[in-house]
Every structure is written in C-alpha cells, then in structure tokens.
Amino acid sequence: MTQSPFPDDLTRRPPNYFAFGGIDRSAHVREQEGWLDAVVARPDTRLVPVWRSRNLFADLGNRVMPPVAALPTVVEAGRLLDLAQEVVFLGDFQGIAHVAVDLSPLDEEMVGTMTGTWGQFSDLREIGPLIERFEGAVMAYARGLMFWHARHGFCGVCGSPTVSAKGGHQRNCTNPDCGASHFPRTDPAVIMLVHDGDRALLGRQKIWPQGMYSTLAGFVEPGESLEEAVAREVFEESGIHI
C-alpha cells in the first residue's frame, strides 16, 4: 500500500473539498520510461473521466442518498483510454492509482453512450461538498489539469505544438530550436467576504440561476499585495471603497 506523504492530522482538519484529498502524487516516478503505460495496464487502476470541464457522477437522480463520484476501473472502462484526448496520472490513494481521462472531443451522444453505465456528467461546483471529501478533491484535480492541457496545446514561446510529458504534468515544445517546457500553475487569487456588522456584500453574474450569489473574488496582479488586490477587486466589482 502506498503511504500518504502527509501527516494524519492534516486529513482530519476541516475539509477543503476541492484541494486536499490525501493523494500521493508520486512525482518521483513520473520520468521513468514506460511507467504510465504500466499504470494504465493495472486492472484496479481507477479512471477519473472529464468531459468539457464536467465530472462523472453516479446517483444524481437519487434524492435520498448524496451523489457519488463515478470512478470506474480499467477492467470496467478500459476503452475510455483509447478515446481519451489526454491521459494524466493523478496519484495513488490507498494503494490504488487514479488516472484522469479527457473525453472532451466526443459529442454529447457519444460520451453518453460510452459512460452512461456509470453515471452522467455534471459541474463539480454545483455538487461540491455533497460528495465524499477525497472524491471532490480528485475530481477538481483532474478537471484543473485537463483545463490546463486544453489551453496549452501550443508553445507560448514559439507557437509550435506541444506534447504531454511526465504523466501529464508537463508539456514540451516539439520545435527542436525551442524546446521550452511548460508546467501547470495556479494563479494567485483572493476570495473575500466584505461585511458591515450583520450584512455581507455579495455579487452575482447574469448567467447564474435566480437567487444564486457569491462572495467577491479576483486575481492578484503583478507587484500587488493580497490586501491591495482585495481593495481593488471590491471596487471594480461593486464600486465600494474599503
């Protein structure tokens, strides 16, 4: 069994469903030749399907039980590996490898035919903490990496095509005169709750469902402190100075 690299007390803290799932990302083995092929050949490896930034869930129609992630094994859904635009190793959890597969090129009818046995695709943000903690984290992880792959198919330095490397955690430029490597990165951002006593400042987008509101948020600009970003974003989104 793969030992988690994190202390047990971290997994017992109040959960962040989209960030910490205790998965061992095994970065030290990603460079080994043929390693990913061996991972996807294991019958018990679990697949984390992603389709156009949506994740696969089972039991969405059950109003009694909470939804659960649909994570079929290679034995059950190995054909998805042949259809995937990208195959990315996520890590090991309790001795089981988890691999994300991007099915975005498939149209809605085809993806429904290929995955309908296990569930249906839905927006993870709409389900959030209703699902089990590890499932939420691994689904967000898979969705984030596939989002990055979809937007870095070409080199930002010379414009040549890039190819996936190191289990899907790097993309390399195919131009021998360039050879740039690109990595997934998280942009710094602020999410803030502005309040005045028992009142809170919330915002919404026109496309959101009626009655849906959110705290304000935004990206941190170069050379800007977190506090400055909060003040700027609040003014930009609401016209209120803090």
Can you describe what each PLM-predicted range is?
Residues 214-242:
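The catalytic Nudix box helix
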Residues 171-214, 241:
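N-terminal strand-loop-strand
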Residues 1-131:
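N-terminal alpha-helical interaction blocks
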Residues 69-73, 136, 172-176:
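Short Pro/Gly-enriched beta-strand edge/turn motifs at strand-loop
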Residues 83, 116, 209-212, 217:
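Functional cleft and adjacent loop/helix regions within the main domain
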Residues 129-147:
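Short, charged surface segments at domain edges that flank catalytic/cofactor-binding sites
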Residues 144-147, 152-191:
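Acidic, metal-coordinating catalytic segment for phosphate/diphosphate chemistry
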Residues 159-165, 195-197, 239-241:
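Secondary-structure boundary elements
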